[in-house]
Amino acid sequence: MVLINGVAVVAVKKKEPIVIGPIEYVKVTGHHGEARVKGKVDTGASRTSVDVWLAANIGLGPTVDVAKVKSAFLDEVRTRPLVRGVVEIAGVRFALPVTVNDRSDMRYPVLVGMDILKSGRFLIDPTKRAPKYASKTQKVDPHPA
């Protein structure tokens, strides 16, 4: 405690941000289970997005609204369902609405957007590699053959 102009000030240590890379393991939890999959961290995406197959498999939902999403590659706005879900990245859990989209032609079934990144808990290091997968949670292949 320090006295400044006669006022007691308690120094509070700010929590250090958690350093994450551009690709991280993400746990997504729904009504029927959970899955740990690799997800892409995207500072250009306003919302977190989950592949439609993965969302159905673990029971994300119900649909709470629709979101208008502008594609980075196409000059058009599309609507996507917003469903309730729980997303965990680097040990931090977020209960939030996520968009559901067909990501079968994309490398990662989850896109972590600014709705999570704005929490201020993360620092993104583009040189950091995704951690090795080590968990008792069963991995789910988001796009089975």
Description of each model-found segment:
Residues 2-145:
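Pepsin/retropepsin-fold aspartyl endopeptidases
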